[in-house]
Swiss-Prot record:
Its EC number is 2.3.1.16. It is found in: Cytoplasm. Belongs to the thiolase-like superfamily. Thiolase family. This is 3-ketoacyl-CoA thiolase. One of its GO terms (cellular component) is cytosol. The gene is fadI. GO terms for molecular function: acetyl-CoA C-acyltransferase activity.
C-alpha cells in the first residue's frame, strides 16, 4: 500500500489553487496559426494576473512546460517571467512530461510551497502544432557545420557537391516514440484490439464528449475559465474552442475511415484528439497566504502520483497505474470521488483504461493489488466533455483539467475529484483535488 501523502506546509496549510485560466483551444493552422507557444503562454499568464488584479511582483516561481519545444526559446518559463512584468529575480524553469506536463508543473510548484521555499507560484503549459521546429537532415546539418569552418571557396563547393536533393528536404518533428517508432495512434489501435474496444464504443464516447462540451459552453460553465485572445497580427479574435462539434450526430462519426490501420482499424480522426494550439495556467499558493491576500481558492491539491510502464504495448494505460497510487496517497477510494476527469487522447485509450479500472485481473497481475481500482460511475466521468472535444495542446491539457474540475466541483458543493492522464513514453499522471 502506498503511503499517505501530506501535501501541507509545516504549519499544516494546504496547497491552494487560487485561479486558473486558459486560451481558447484551436485546431492546428486555424485561429493561432503562426502564434508560437511562448506567445500564448505569456498571453494567458498576463491575462490571469490582470483578471485577479494581482501584482505580478508577488510571484516567486514559475514552472511551465512545452512539449514541442522551439530551439530559440528552450526555457519557456523564464521567457514568460520576462514578458509579463514579474520581478526579474523570479525563479523560473521548464518541465516536460509529454501530455502530463502541466500536472508535473503543478506538482513542482506545490513541492516548493511545501518546502517553504516559496509562498506563491504559477504552473502551466503551452503548445503550438502550427509553429513547429522544422529541422534538417543529419547530412545537411553536418555539411553546414563543415561549411562554417571551410576557409576557401573550393572547399565549400566540394562540400556542397556531396549533398543530394533528399538531403535538402526539411525534417518535421517526429510523431512516433523515439525508442520504438510506434505512434500514439498505432498504440490506440493496439489497445482497441487487445482490450476489445469496438468502433461503435469509440464513436459513442467521442459523440458524448462533444455533446457534453457543447452543452457546457452553451450553459456558460466554461466561459469563466477561457480568455478572449487577440493573436497577432490582431486582425481577429477568438474566445471559444473551435474543435467542438456542436451539432454532430452519432451516425456522422461512423462515416470516417480508420486513420492508422486502414484495413482493420477502428481509430479515426473523429474519435481521436486533433492537433491543437493553446495555453493554460494556474496560480498556486500557501492556503494562509491566499487568506492574507483576500483570495478565495478554487480548491486544493490533495495528492498526486506519476507512473511509468513499457512502451511496446498498452503505452497509454498510465491512468490505470497512477490513479491507485494517488488515491492511496489521499487516503480515499474511487467511490469517494465526486468527479473523475480522464484525459481523452483517443476514445480507444480512454475506454481501455475505464475497463482496467474495473478489472480485478488487471489489478492482481499489473498492480499487485487484490481488488480492482473500482468501476467508474459514468455519471461522474468527464461530465463536461473531455479532450476529444476541447482539443489537446499537449502541455496545456493538465492545467485545463485542474481548473475545469475544481470549478465544477464547487458547483456541486465540493468533495474530491480525480484528474488523470496518459502520456507518451508509457508515462501516466493522477491528481486528487478537493473543493469546499
Amino acid at each position: 500500500m502506498t503511503r499517505l501523502q501530506n501535501l501541507t506546509t509545516r504549519q499544516g496549510e494546504r496547497i491552494a489553487v487560487v485561479s486558473g485560466l486558459r486560451t481558447p483551444f484551436a485546431r492546428q493552422a486555424t485561429a493561432f496559426n503562426g502564434v508560437p507557444a511562448l506567445d500564448m503562454g505569456k498571453m494567458v499568464v498576463n491575462e490571469m494576473l490582470q483578471e485577479l488584479d494581482f501584482d505580478p511582483k508577488l510571484i516567486e516561481q514559475v514552472v511551465f512546460g512545452q512539449v514541442v519545444q522551439m530551439p530559440e526559446a528552450p526555457n519557456i518559463a523564464r521567457e514568460i517571467v520576462l514578458g509579463t512584468g514579474m520581478h526579474i529575480g523570479t525563479d523560473a524553469y521548464s518541465v516536460t512530461r509529454a501530455c502530463a506536463t502541466s500536472f508535473q508543473a503543478a506538482a513542482n510548484v506545490a513541492e516548493s510551497i511545501i518546502s517553504g521555499t516559496i509562498d506563491i507560484g504559477i504552473a502551466g503549459g503551452a503548445d503550438s502544432s502550427s509553429v513547429l521546429p522544422i529541422g534538417v537532415s543529419k547530412k545537411l546539418a553536418a555539411t553546414l557545420l563543415a561549411l562554417s569552418k571551410a576557409r576557401t571557396m573550393s572547399k565549400r563547393l566540394k562540400l556542397l557537391s556531396t549533398l543530394s536533393v533528399k538531403d535538402l528536404m526539411p525534417v518535421p518533428p517526429a510523431v512516433a516514440e523515439y525508442s520504438t517508432g510506434i505512434s500514439m495512434g498505432q498504440t490506440a489501435e493496439q489497445m482497441a484490439k487487445s482490450h476489445g474496444i469496438t468502433r461503435q464504443e469509440q464513436d459513442a464516447l467521442a459523440y458524448r464528449s462533444h455533446t457534453l462540451a457543447a452543452k457546457a459552453w452553451k450553459d456558460g460553465l466554461i466561459r469563466g475559465e477561457v480568455m478572449t485572445a487577440f493573436p497577432e497580427p490582431y486582425g481577429q479574435w477568438i474566445d471559444k474552442d473551435n474543435n467542438i462539434r456542436e451539432d454532430s450526430t452519432l451516425e456522422s462519426y461512423a462515416k470516417l475511415r480508420p486513420a492508422f490501420d486502414r484495413k482493420f482499424g477502428t481509430v479515426t480522426a473523429a474519435n481521436s484528439t486533433p492537433l491543437t494550439d493553446g495555453a493554460a495556467a494556474i496560480l498556486l499558493m500557501r492556503e494562509g497566504r491566499a487568506k492574507e491576500l483576500g483570495l478565495k481558492p478554487l480548491g486544493y491539491i490533495r495528492s498526486y502520483a506519476f507512473s511509468a510502464i513499457g512502451v511496446e504495448q498498452d503505452m497509454l494505460m498510465g491512468p490505470s497505474y497512477a490513479t491507485p497510487m494517488a488515491l492511496d496517497r489521499a487516503g480515499i477510494s474511487l467511490s469517494d470521488l465526486t468527479l473523475i476527469d480522464m484525459h481523452e487522447a483517443f476514445a480507444a485509450q480512454t475506454l481501455a483504461n475505464v475497463k482496467m479500472f474495473g478489472s480485478k485481473k488487471f489489478a492482481q497481475e499489473n498492480l499487485g493489488r487484490s481488488q480492482a481500482i473500482g468501476e467508474i460511475d459514468m455519471d461522474k466521468f468527464n461530465v463536461l466533455g473531455g479532450s476529444l472535444a476541447y482539443g489537446h495542446p499537449f502541455a496545456a491539457t493538465g492545467a485545463r483539467m485542474i481548473t475545469q474540475t475544481l470549478r465544477e466541483l464547487q458547483r456541486r458543493g465540493g468533495g474530491f475529484a480525480l484528474n488523470t492522464a496518459c502520456a507518451a513514453g508509457g508515462l501516466g499522471a493522477a491528481m486528487i483535488l478537493e473543493a469546499e
